[in-house]
């Protein structure tokens, strides 16, 4: 049974793949994050990942089950076939991936769809589409986690995107704990992070800071 999308799922959104935690067991990293209280998990295994297609699917099955047990949405990045095979709760696509309308048609009524938007023009186009649950906007700050990241948006740019968007926006890119209140003040529904959690010495405290920042917004 897939979970329906709720804006509160964006409050503490964890994005991760094997390439982000070299030498570590991604299963254990994700379980620690789930125990800490993350509100969504995106399986983004790409870039420097060494996994084969079969290995990526097998690991995805394990992660999907962990998320299901925690009642946290399991979201697959980019890969429609993988998302369908794993019966994911959601799929996140970028502007350069399969055109989002095709993705929406493929996964209709099976999972929710998130779309990366980093410019006002992209948000305005997304507003015209049926079937977009949320937008991922950024990078808000410079990031080292994505080699193909778009130009930095900044807090002012994020506020404009949030005001323009007709669905919830989650901020992504180069975010630190200290910046969480300022991000929440823009009206963003939450933050999507990779290294802020994978490199955290205390993941529970970091997730708590993410949740605290979005209280009352």
From Swiss-Prot:
It holds the Pfam family TMP-TENI. InterPro entries: Aldolase_TIM, ThiamineP_synth_sf, ThiamineP_synth_TenI, TMP_synthase. It catalyses: 2-[(2R,5Z)-2-carboxy-4-methylthiazol-5(2H)-ylidene]ethyl phosphate + 4-amino-2-methyl-5-(diphosphooxymethyl)pyrimidine + 2 H(+) = thiamine phosphate + CO2 + diphosphate; 2-(2-carboxy-4-methylthiazol-5-yl)ethyl phosphate + 4-amino-2-methyl-5-(diphosphooxymethyl)pyrimidine + 2 H(+) = thiamine phosphate + CO2 + diphosphate; 4-methyl-5-(2-phosphooxyethyl)-thiazole + 4-amino-2-methyl-5-(diphosphooxymethyl)pyrimidine + H(+) = thiamine phosphate + diphosphate. Keywords: Magnesium, Metal-binding, Thiamine biosynthesis, Transferase. GO terms for cellular component: cytoplasm. Pathway: Cofactor biosynthesis; thiamine diphosphate biosynthesis; thiamine phosphate from 4-amino-2-methyl-5-diphosphomethylpyrimidine and 4-methyl-5-(2-phosphoethyl)-thiazole: step 1/1. It comes from the Bacteria. The keyword Metal-binding applies. Its cofactor is Mg(2+). 4-amino-2-methyl-5-(diphosphooxymethyl)pyrimidine binds at residues 42-46, 77, 116, 146. NCBIfam families: thiE. Condenses 4-methyl-5-(beta-hydroxyethyl)thiazole monophosphate (THZ-P) and 2-methyl-4-amino-5-hydroxymethyl pyrimidine pyrophosphate (HMP-PP) to form thiamine monophosphate (TMP). Belongs to the thiamine-phosphate synthase family. This is Thiamine-phosphate synthase. It comes from Lactiplantibacillus plantarum (strain ATCC BAA-793 / NCIMB 8826 / WCFS1). The lineage of its organism: Bacteria, Bacillati, Bacillota, Bacilli, Lactobacillales. The gene is thiE.
